[in-house]
């Protein structure tokens, strides 16, 4: 396990009280190169949107959905934070573009439109068919959560998430990875790879990365595949902690530094260093 495991252990002590679930495995064999509490189920914010994309891709593959189908946003779908559609004038988009917005910029409005189209129950059923017990998308995206709403958007464990990403990759080129490939959030583990967040679909510096992140107060999650000259790795780095709402609090900085440290170890491993 070497340097990857060492970086994971350093992360565990980076922020007092933080809970981590971490797993890194070989892309081809599934052999572990590092882990810590990989079965712990933590909040994963937007990572759970993967399940909606998987359900859509499955329907397309079975001929039950057409990516050219145009869907409209409604007032009930509107939500702030991540995404572009809320800033665009267009009211309707084909499902292909809705999925690309979710994969590329974790678009919250597009997520709500897709979930309304698919049905949240179908997404839950898909998770069960995939054999997932911790990885769940619990709800639509909301600006505020009331006591009547599920307390978190999504959850998961590092072990199940690395298994899910590895399965997506082993199935060969597919829609879900195509939607994730241009993803612009390289601010967490992937910040160590030194790639252009806006243009990294092609191999750069000998590296190729596909990932999905999740961000909320006290939640950071990065799940991905990184391939280099020596090998490919699948990783899931999840962390939950109590983040004070004070300008001078450094807990987030410590968490981000630890995630980048893990990314540096992953980069060295896939490069053969």
Model-based region annotation:
Residues 62-88:
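Short, glycine/proline-biased beta-turn/loop segments that scaffold the active-site neighborhood
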Residues 16-20, 115-172:
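Mid-domain, small-residue-enriched loop/turn segments at the edges of structured enzyme/sensor domains
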Residues 30, 43-71, 235:
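Active-site SXXK
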Residues 54-62, 116, 163-170, 264-268:
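Short glycine/serine- and small hydrophobic-enriched flexible loop segments
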């Amino acid at each position: 396990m070497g340097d990857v495991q060492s970086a994971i252990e350093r992360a565990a002590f980076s922020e007092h009280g933080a809970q981590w679930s971490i797993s890194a495995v070989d892309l081809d064999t599934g052999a572990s190169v590092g882990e810590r509490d990989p079965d712990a189920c933590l909040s994963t914010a937007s990572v759970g949107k993967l399940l909606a994309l998987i359900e859509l891709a499955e329907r397309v593959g079975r001929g039950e959905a057409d990516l050219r189908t145009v869907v409209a946003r409604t007032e009930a779908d509107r939500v702030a934070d991540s995404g572009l559609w809320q800033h665009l004038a267009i009211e309707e988009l084909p499902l292909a573009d809705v999925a690309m917005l979710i994969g590329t910029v974790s678009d919250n409005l597009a997520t709500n439109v897709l979930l309304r189209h698919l049905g949240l129950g179908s997404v839950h059923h898909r998770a069960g068919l995939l054999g997932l017990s911790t990885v769940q998308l619990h709800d639509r995206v909301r600006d505020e959560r009331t006591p009547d709403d599920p307390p978190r958007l999504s959850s998961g464990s590092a072990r199940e998430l690395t298994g899910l990403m590895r399965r997506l990759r082993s199935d060969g080129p597919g829609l879900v990875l195509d939607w994730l490939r241009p993803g612009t959030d390289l601010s967490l583990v992937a910040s160590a790879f030194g790639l252009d967040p806006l243009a990294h679909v092609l191999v750069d510096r000998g590296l190729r990365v596909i990932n999905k992140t999740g961000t909320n107060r006290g939640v950071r999650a990065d799940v991905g595949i990184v391939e280099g000259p020596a090998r490919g790795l699948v990783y899931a780095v999840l962390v939950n902690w109590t983040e004070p709402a004070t300008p001078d609090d450094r807990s987030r900085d410590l968490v981000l530094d630890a995630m980048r440290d893990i990314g540096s170890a992953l980069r060295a491993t896939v490069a053969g260093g």
